[in-house]
A protein has these predicted regions:
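Short intrinsically disordered, low-complexity coil segments enriched in acidic
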Residues: 1-9, 13, 99-100, 107-110, ...
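Conserved SAM/AdoMet-binding glycine-rich loop
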Residues: 1-62, 66-68
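Generic recognition of stable, solvent-exposed alpha-helical segments in well-folded globular domains
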Residues: 3, 41-48, 71-78, 145-155
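Short, charged low-complexity intrinsically disordered segments located at boundaries
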Residues: 4-9, 27, 40, 112, ...
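Short, electropositive alpha-helical surface patch
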Residues: 8-11, 72-88, 151-158
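Flexible glycine/acidic-rich beta-alpha junction loops that bind and position SAM and/or redox cofactors
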Residues: 24-25, 29-36, 66-74, 86-150, ...
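A generic secondary-structure signal for well-formed alpha-helical elements
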Residues: 57, 87-90, 94, 160-164
């Protein structure tokens, strides 16, 4: 099972591959059986594969499909949290009824009560330069998840992905779960509610980069568009911290946890290794003053084709490439003084 991981590691070391994608579609067994993916090795042995990637120091990601038959609101939330809890970057796609696919058959449509909307096929061509557009039948409702629930799941996933997968609230959420303040599911249900109803920078990005697409059922595009992370992380970082401080005020947590949470995600305005003093030892979870040294890691990296193209441009500065490559990745902290 590890042979293709070893090959991927060679490609990564040669700077040909930025990360290995381990596609799983869903963590829900019933859903995988209904779409005939229950025998996929990666789905069954997901932990083995990610542990092997970590052992080889190989960045990795996965893919999931939202809208498969059998998937409910609860199973989707549990499955997605199971994936991101393990630190895996995850591309998410809406389910489409493609010509010739068994899922698109008349029998499947009737049995699974599939409803669809015609949506522009994502990634085929930029309509600005190619006037002929291609459309697909994108699933927007099933027997297990109605139209409103599915749209809500894409919004919930956008917020949860922002917080945990893109690391804006990962340490905050982990601390709350570890200390029995609130589990990850409850935390991100509240985070979604906060973003949707607040008036800060996170709500503005939510409206500009999610809602304007989900209102048109462009679910895949809504989650594939991750370019906003650059400005949110590098340019609007202080506004994000202010938002997170307001959100976190409802929890009984150490005063500087939000600062530690922020330092645990790559910053483009500091030089690493970077040292910060805290009143609490978050590394060892001990109530004592410490100084923590943060260094970069590649973990949590998520890239798009545009990002890969930038890495090969000769007229783009190395510093800019570096920041683009590391944006929203996790840092590693170690105690240097206590």
């Amino acid at each position: 099972k590890s042979e293709f991981i070893k090959m991927a590691k060679k490609l990564y070391d040669a700077d040909v591959l930025q990360s290995l994608c381990l596609s799983i579609q869903s963590r829900h067994e019933t859903s995988l059986k209904l779409v005939k993916r229950a025998t996929m090795d990666v789905s069954k042995d997901f932990k083995y594969y990610i542990d092997k990637c970590r052992e080889m120091d190989l960045p990795y990601s996965t893919e999931m499909m939202l809208g498969n038959p059998g998937e409910t609101v609860d199973t989707w939330k549990d499955g997605y949290l199971d994936v991101v809890r393990s630190g895996v970057s995850c591309d998410i796609y809406a389910v489409a009824l493609l010509p010739g696919a068994e899922l698109a058959s008349a029998k499947s449509r009737e049995e699974n009560e599939l409803e669809y909307e015609l949506v522009q096929f994502p990634g085929v061509a930029n309509p600005k330069y190619r006037p002929v557009r291609e459309y697909m039948e994108q699933v927007v409702s099933t027997k297990w998840m109605n139209r409103d629930e599915m749209r809500e799941m894409f919004a919930w996933t956008w917020c949860t992905r922002l917080g945990h997968e893109f690391n804006f609230t990962r340490e905050l959420a982990n601390y709350c779960e570890t200390h029995d303040i609130i589990d990850l599911l409850g935390f991100y249900n509240k985070f979604h509610e906060y973003i949707a109803n607040s008036d800060g920078v996170l709500n503005q990005y939510y409206k500009d980069h999610l809602l304007f697409r989900t209102d048109k059922y462009e679910y895949t595009l809504a989650l594939k568009n991750i370019g906003f992370r650059d400005s949110l992380s590098l340019d609007d970082r202080e506004g994000v911290k202010e938002d997170i401080n307001v959100f976190a005020s409802q929890f009984d947590i150490p005063a500087d946890l939000v600062e530690f949470n922020d330092a645990s995600m790559f910053r483009g305005d500091v030089r690493y290794p970077w040292r910060v003093k805290f009143d609490y030892d978050f590394v060892n979870d001990i109530d004592e003053e410490v100084e923590i040294e943060f260094t970069e890691t590649a973990y949590g990296r998520a890239t798009a084709t545009r990002d890969n193209l930038i890495q090969g441009m000769s007229d783009v500065s190395d510093d800019y490439k570096y920041k683009k490559r590391m944006v929203c990745t996790r840092t590693a902290g170690k105690i240097v003084n206590s």
